[in-house]
Amino acid sequence: MPAIKKRKIAREAPQQEDHSDSEAHSSASEDAAPNTTEQEQEPSEAPKQAPKSFKELGLIEQLCEACDSMGYKAPTAIQAEAIPLALQGRDLIGLAETGSGKTAAFALPILQALMDKPSSFFGLVLAPTRELAYQISQAFEGLGSTISVRSTVLVGGMDMVSQSIALGKKPHIIVATPGRLLDHLENTKGFSLRNLKYLVMDEADRLLDMDFGPILDKILKVLPRERRTYLFSATMSSKVESLQRASLQNPLRVAVSSSKFQTVSTLQQSYIFIPHKHKDLYLVYLLNEFVGQSCIIFCRTVHETQRLSFFLRLLGFGAIPLHGQLSQSARLGALGKFRSRSRDILVATDVAARGLDIPSVDVVLNFDLPGDSKTFIHRIGRTARAGKSGVAISFATQYDVEAWLRIEGALGKKLPEYPAEKDEVMVLAERVSEAQRSAILEMKNYDEKKGSRGKKFAKGKRSREDMDQEEG
């Protein structure tokens, strides 16, 4: 393990309660961790001037220099709020979206503490996807470059043996997806986190949405209770509240309000509030309403994207899928057919929301709401481009109320509900039900061709190996 250069002036360690005789409670327990009263960070009477430098936040010179070398000119809002509190030794709940600078908000305090008391397996960051895990690890290594910090990434899809060798080198920071971390805790000889000092759960709402809850419970049970914990999430759902109660001690909450996103005046936006079980039914109704127009249907997962493509084809719609698990040639083929209008419906994950050369379309349907407001804006930005008009309709079910309110908050306005005719919708029920059954068979055939990896999609569940795949 490389030597960490200790800081010249040691900061006095904060007083902490002794919890060494008890394990962390399960996040499934509603009455877990009784001493977890959440404290809101109260705004001051007069507005404070935003810190202009990282030094003003209490960071040492080496880390300030690292921020400068990384191109961080001034602290973002979440960094300005979270870093001083973290340096005081408090557990934190950070409500902030992707792109807010939250990675540095938790990485910098951990690195500063690491310089005081260098040790292996000092910090653990849990992330929902492989791509995010690598991004976080790169941030730690970049910010810790002047103090020789080493991190390792544990994610699915990679060789367990090479990861075990990396763990044997005793890195300071581990960035992992929950499934693969638990695999190593259970199977890698000599690997333990009993001396862990810092735990971060990044994008906690997505961790729970992706069914990592039971795995998180198992991980929390083997971590030392005497640690600092940071939980970052875009939303504060009931599941996240439960996870907070199980894992944090007297946390402070810091929230950064989203800026109001602007949309063009030629875009007609609305939402449709329906029971989750009727999503397919209302999708067919809307496609009939906009027949002949080009449409992108956005889904949250690869499985749902592929299933909807089969389902719509069975009903006679010219639908084609686009997602990250297609080969490059298949993705280019799908885009080519959509551009040429030989297929007028593109069913896609968020790979189609940004970065791809997709022409403007007539209609965007958010079949699944995205995890953050910025992605929502990118999605609906696929229509009403270059002065043209466009329509964007978002599906909201009983499970999406908080997410939808957050999106409306980011937009800065309430959107109208789309006036669906329920009687006309229900007329389609028999045909839709038949197509759903046939689509299940189509998915089974598709999975058999894909092999054992695909069979996991057929059941709608993923093993630990696949749970952390980027949804796009």
Curated annotation (Swiss-Prot):
GO terms for cellular component: cytosol; nucleus. Residues 1-52, 443-472 are annotated as: Disordered. The keyword RNA-binding applies. A motif (DEAD box) lies at residues 202-205. A motif (Q motif) lies at residues 52-80. It is found in: Nucleus. Residues 10-24 have a biased composition (Basic and acidic residues). Coiled coil: none annotated. ATP binds at residues 96-103. PROSITE patterns: DEAD_ATP_HELICASE (PS00039), HELICASE_ATP_BIND_1 (PS51192), HELICASE_CTER (PS51194), Q_MOTIF (PS51195). GO terms for molecular function: ATP binding; ATP hydrolysis activity; RNA binding; RNA helicase activity. The keyword ATP-binding applies. It catalyses: ATP + H2O = ADP + phosphate + H(+). Keywords: ATP-binding, Helicase, Hydrolase, Nucleotide-binding, Nucleus, Ribosome biogenesis, RNA-binding, rRNA processing. Its main location: nucleus. Residues 83-254 form the Helicase ATP-binding domain. Residues 452-462 have a biased composition (Basic residues). ATP-dependent rRNA helicase required for pre-ribosomal RNA processing. Involved in the maturation of the 35S-pre-rRNA and to its cleavage to mature 18S rRNA. Interacts with the SSU processome. The Q motif is unique to and characteristic of the DEAD box family of RNA helicases and controls ATP binding and hydrolysis. This is ATP-dependent rRNA helicase rrp3. It comes from Aspergillus oryzae (strain ATCC 42149 / RIB 40) (Yellow koji mold). The lineage of its organism: Eukaryota, Fungi, Dikarya, Ascomycota, Pezizomycotina. The gene is rrp3.
